[in-house]
Amino acid sequence: MSSDSMRNIRNFSIIAHVDHGKSTLADRIIQLCGGLQAREMEAQVLDSNPIERERGITIKAQSVSLPYTAKDGQTYHLNFIDTPGHVDFSYEVSRSLAACEGALLVVDAAQGVEAQSVANCYTAVEQGLEVVPVLNKIDLPTADVDRAKAEIEAVIGIDAEDAVAVSAKTGLNIDLVLEAIVHRIPPPKPRDTDKLQALIIDSWFDNYLGVVSLVRVMQGEIKPGSKILVMSTGRTHLVDKVGVFTPKRKELPALGAGEVGWINASIKDVHGAPVGDTLTLAGDPAPHALPGFQEMQPRVFAGLFPVDAEDYPDLREALDKLRLNDAALRFEPESSEAMGFGFRCGFLGMLHMEIVQERLEREYNLDLISTAPTVVYEVLKTDGTVINMDNPAKLPQLNLVQEIREPIIRANVLTPEEYIGNIIKLCEEKRGTQIGINYLGSQVQISYELPMAEVVLDFFDKLKSVSRGYASLDYHFVRFDAGPFVRVDVLINGDKVDALSLIVHRGHADRRGRELCEKMKDLIPRQMFDVAIQAAIGSQIISRSTVKAMRKNVLAKCYGGDVSRKKKLLEKQKEGKKRMKQVGRVEIPQEAFLAVLQMDK
């Protein structure tokens, strides 16, 4: 495609923290360009998944192509690619940004800049995008435009003098945003090769069409009937249909360079079209793939088990279907003595895990029990081999282990000054190492290296509570570090419950074991016999608590009388309880498994 025909194309994305009004701004832009009639408009048009709407977050990338007649009389093609805002989905954000030449940085004028926007904005600047700041929610009485501009300049370091102040809710100044997109964001540049290169921004599964991929054509063109090659897998597919979203799906005869649209090539699962991969023509391939592709690595693992064992095949089918849509989800069958058959699943983070579990329960009507989430540890065995271990129950015997290494992340926290003390205290409690503190205007950026295991459980919630909701967090994986780690097992009446095992730092093991036993004592219902709950490291018991038996008062019918008669009755009761204990099994309620999660609370 010539540079002339690309001159009026603008590809842009919106960067914003959760709740800063990104989806509402997108709705207004679609409405103003006539993508949907007023009666077809509904709030958050692009958040198509019901969970996205309820939680007010965007999970998957979506796109929309709109014609816009600018004030200079020319018609421009705006391709808007929606991005997720949560830290768990940062790889999807980087792919969406790679498909654009510019980005709108949306900042809530009342709240100021948050860490997630900073991280995504840095990604955009690194990829050479033109960033246009937009201050949203100026209709709020607490909005402070000048302060927000100063924060953008101090924290992110881009010029905010020409920032557009808008209210997406009322539609104020949305036309100025469109003019800024047209005049400040550059058109796509022609590449040095004329062979087809298309970046896969996202893929999802459609029951009728198979996999539909959202692509940005960098060079060349795709049309129905072309034979395309997926560069990382080496597979070839025949293109059935191509088109754009307006937001409705609209078929086109071809997609040319600079354009963003969807293609359907009868691929059967999402793994056949991985996010971030490059498509090219099988007969005339491009010399190299587009940069930046990486396999998505799950960071958090948990066991998912059906409450009713008969639901196991349904759970397998549901996970298979979800995986069609979610390339980051990994799972493999797992059996546990305490919980029966289920799956060990890998997720990007805690939010991802919650969303997957919620979708399984809601869309497939399954009742599930999830075990405590764990991170992946590297275990160096005495024979020199290194294994990745995502399940504490699978830790080899201690005499075979030379060292255990845990994943370390670099966390950047942005907070108002008055909460610095609380946040540093929290990070120190979580075994953090301080890297630095930067004062940026009225905000402070605190950098820490923290063990991922400490962050995964409840760090985010605690961070919000010690800073009254003002601090925001962004993190990325750095390396594995060795440390003195042990596995704490939970025994109930002498039987090990594998689903409750956890790997902890040696220094915290006694406290965690004690807390766990106390918590379990409150949650396991009383039986007809004593239930002993013990925490152990190997064969050493570090803590114990007992759930006392329910017992009938067998002496009630003895009014006075001989003491030996009473003793006989009590001994008889004791014998009965002993027999009961040998045959009795303790049912462990779901809350007990969740107790492991909420230990520090």
Curated annotation (Swiss-Prot):
Please give a single GO biological process term from the UniProt record.
positive regulation of translation
Q: Which reaction does it catalyse?
A: GTP + H2O = GDP + phosphate + H(+)
Q: What is this protein called?
A: Elongation factor 4
Membrane disposition: Peripheral membrane protein
Q: Where the protein is mainly located, per its record?
A: membrane
Per UniProt, the keywords (alphabetical) are:
Cell inner membrane, Cell membrane, GTP-binding, Hydrolase, Membrane, Nucleotide-binding, Protein biosynthesis
Q: Which species does the entry assign this protein to?
A: Xanthomonas axonopodis pv. citri (strain 306)
Recorded GO cellular component terms are: plasma membrane
